[in-house]
Amino acid sequence: MDICDISASQLATSPPPRTAIDFNSSIEESPVKRVKFSPELTKSFEETLSPTVTLVLRNNEEVIFDRYLLSFYSNYFRVLFSSKFRDSNSTTHRIRLISASDLHFLLTIPKAFEQGIKPNITLQKAIELLEPAAFLQMSIALDYISDIICKNLTHENIIKIFRLALLYHTTLAVRVWRSMVRKFQTLFATNVYLSLKENELIGLLTDKHLNLKSEDETTVVVNWIKHNSPLQSDRLTQFAQRNFSRRPQPDATKYEVIRTRQPMDAIVCFGGWASRGVAQKIEVCNTRSDRWQTCNFNYDIPNIHRAYHGIEVVEDKLIVYGGFDGIKQFQTTVLFDLSTKEWRRGANMNDKRCYVTSARVNDSYGRPLVFACGGMNGVSRLKTAEMYDYRADQWTEVANMTQMRSDGAVVTIDNKIVAIGGFDGRNIHQGGEVYDPVLDLWHPLSSNMRTRRTGCTAVSIMNQVCMIIGGFNGNRRLDSAEIYDMREGLWHPEPTLQTARSNFSACQMDTCYVYVAGGFDGQTTTKESERLDLRSKMWQALPDMAEAKSALRMVTLSDHPFLDELFDIPDDTGIVTSW
């Protein structure tokens, strides 16, 4: 029998409550939570005749444990030993649920964390320990076991693990439910979803975060009903008949869907230069409908509206630095926490920088660092570069580039920074250079682009490969694109844009698409956007942005609670409460 298999009589048949779509938990090792003994517990230990207790475990195994040790790591024992139960001071307690080896294993988890060691636990062992850890309320071990389980979720085991978690640990069930919502397109493609219970499928279909294409919703319901008996699918049939409606899609086709859904991923546009100065609107691209919409960003953050600035999202922190507001060049840094919705001023850069390019790499410990390369300080173009550690709130100068560059493109490839093109005040560059953060050294690329470019943008599209798009060659705005393969050191042409542009922004989404938006087309700032399908090698026109702007910056957010505020899609409680 599969370790996740449980009898039908044991199943908790309701999907998690609304918190399932709001819960956001980091899947990392849990820190040790220190506890302080209450006066009642201390007094109980002082009055008891024995500081040890004998536990009669599974198969009548008898093991002697220290009361303090058990109380320190288990809420169950802490309450048992400190309460006025008849057997609280008893020297013997029976717990048939757990074996001696498993209890010893659970106790070693927090001890290992105290020594800075990460315990090695397999998925099967974690599932076996879930029930006893939950019963004994061993929070440190339970959190770590939950982390192990969440890291090993696949489309094949996720449904069984969800049902198991509902029995023993609802916090884990919420996390697995959230993962099931994210992975549902894969569950559909592999037909694994057919093993869902009727109420589980209804619960998923009512979730606004469900990752399912609109054209597949009818197929999901029809195939599930065919796979199950009429008695098992009666409620789903009624649910579908009541809630399916026709909603228009961007490609002019129409699909029957249960409800409006929020995309798992989004592109957010900050700042830029519009017709009346710095752009004030913050726009978000709905990647389900491929439409731009103005979002309500009601947070009073000083100097968040900039043009020609740098911006990165690092561990829930939106970091904005440098740039230009039409009057002065910025040296300041602003950090906005996407989880707490709080902002703070960061340390100033070592120099003012507008027309700056930004990138992110990880240090040898895996910690993310933000880099600002080149730009202009109001007097001259810069060849300097510096890195920012937001934890220490410190900018540190690194090795200078070999050439002054403003309005160039910077991209991260294989944890190295590649700076391409740009302008030095006299010449537009055709070459590029690579920065190795380990050696703190820049060295030139092995070949030049096919044309000079400034005001261009670059994205990393796969391992060791980047794409540079658009720009200005000194005579005209460019609609061309090229890719550079670090392994062979050569440039190759790519399909041309539908609109020539410079000083725009681009980003990759879903490993399949490259989105570009805004910029200057040679006559005026533009609101046009388009995307490149990397599979078909074709550019596709998208609906316009709400505001024409250049010098904008775009970032991607994936499966983040902050998307709820940006899109503001109603929960549609009428669908949920009726079922």
Curated annotation (Swiss-Prot):
InterPro entries: BACK (IPR011705), BTB-kelch_protein (IPR017096), BTB/POZ_dom (IPR000210), Kelch-typ_b-propeller (IPR015915), Kelch_1 (IPR006652), SKP1/BTB/POZ_sf (IPR011333). GO terms for molecular function: ubiquitin-like ligase-substrate adaptor activity. It comes from the Eukaryota. Pfam families: BACK (PF07707), BTB (PF00651), Kelch_1 (PF01344), Kelch_KLHDC2_KLHL20_DRC7 (PF24681). One of its GO terms (biological process) is proteasome-mediated ubiquitin-dependent protein catabolic process. Keywords: Kelch repeat, Repeat. Kelch repeats lie at residues 266-316, 317-363, 369-415, 417-463, 465-511, 513-559. Residues 51-119 form the BTB domain. Disulfide bonds: none annotated. One of its GO terms (cellular component) is Cul3-RING ubiquitin ligase complex. This is Kelch repeat and BTB domain-containing protein F47D12.7.
